[in-house]
């Protein structure tokens, strides 16, 4: 809509990834230090929704009126990148840093796989809801995007409010906590890495997987619409997403029964295929 270039999109993806990583480290350590999860999750979801709503105001007519002496298109692109980082900060604070930690706090070896399986299934369901639910919108119209931003904002704000009433604050011991900054750098110490070689090998493998997804997903829809000239690409994506969601949930249950060692090898083999 702002005639953004491929370089602009790459810059936004890179900045968002850095924001998510740094935020998860800083807020995750702060949550551990304070022994609080719920306030970060609820507050983060609410602010996440409000930051999404701000995109409805980043329009060339609005920006051009407020700043007539600069290129409205260029300023809109810059503001989108900045607000994407702000949105990512709130989202990563709530979800990546604190919700995932809360989920780990509330489960054990007998139930963690089932819970994580359902949790991992949700992004797939969300993709289906977004692309399926918004298919009827004319995305070339600004009003359609404004409506979409309002809907998503409302969902997050309501979810954040519900968090205050629906989840319990886990009992986290903070007496023996190290200093805040020691908690942040703990996982990067060479001695810790040497003590947990398998863990860090798997983290490295997952990082490679994450890089591939970040490269693949932004251009998947463009491939469908521009290269294949498909208008009903959701009908292609939907069956794959549904099957992947079901398999993810079932494999989480299998993980609880098989254990980590016997369940991770088939998972990696499937990814390699």
Model-identified regions with their sequence ranges:
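Pair of pore-lining "gating" transmembrane helices in MFS-fold secondary transporters
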Residues: 1, 195-216
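Short amphipathic helix-loop junctions that connect adjacent transmembrane helices
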Residues: 1-8, 216-234
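Glycine-rich segments within core transmembrane alpha-helices of 12-TM secondary carriers
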Residues: 19-21, 113-138
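Helix-to-loop junctions at the C-terminal end of transmembrane segments
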Residues: 22-36, 247-260
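Structural signature of the two symmetry-related core transmembrane helices
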Residues: 39-54, 262-273
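Helix-loop junctions on the cytosolic side of multi-pass membrane transporters
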Residues: 60-62, 163-177
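Juxtamembrane intracellular "pre-TM" segments in multi-pass secondary transporters
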Residues: 171-203
């Amino acid at each position: 809509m702002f005639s953004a270039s491929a370089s602009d999109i790459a810059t936004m993806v890179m900045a968002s990834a850095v924001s998510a990583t740094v935020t998860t480290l800083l807020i995750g350590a702060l949550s551990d230090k304070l022994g609080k999860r719920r306030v970060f999750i609820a507050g983060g979801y609410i602010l996440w929704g409000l930051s999404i709503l701000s995109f409805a105001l980043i329009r060339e007519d609005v920006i051009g009126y407020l700043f007539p002496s600069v290129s409205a298109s260029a300023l809109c692109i810059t503001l989108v990148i900045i607000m994407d980082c702000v949105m990512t900060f709130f989202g990563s604070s709530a979800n990546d840093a604190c919700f995932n930690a809360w989920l780990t706090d509330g489960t054990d070896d007998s139930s963690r796989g089932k819970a994580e399986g359902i949790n991992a299934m949700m992004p797939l369901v969300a993709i289906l809801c977004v692309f399926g639910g918004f298919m009827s919108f004319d995305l070339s119209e600004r009003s359609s995007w404004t409506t979409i931003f309002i809907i998503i904002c409302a969902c997050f704000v309501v979810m954040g409010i519900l968090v205050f009433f629906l989840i319990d604050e886990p009992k986290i011991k903070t007496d023996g906590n190290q200093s805040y900054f020691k908690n942040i750098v703990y996982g990067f110490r060479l001695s810790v890495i040497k003590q947990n070689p398998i863990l860090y090998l798997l983290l490295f493998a997952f990082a490679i997987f994450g890089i591939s997804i970040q490269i693949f997903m932004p251009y998947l829809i463009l491939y469908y619409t521009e290269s294949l000239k498909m208008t009903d690409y959701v009908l292609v994506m939907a069956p794959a997403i549904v099957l992947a969601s079901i398999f993810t949930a079932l494999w989480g249950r299998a993980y609880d029964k098989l254990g980590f060692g016997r369940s991770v090898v088939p998972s990696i083999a499937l990814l390699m295929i």
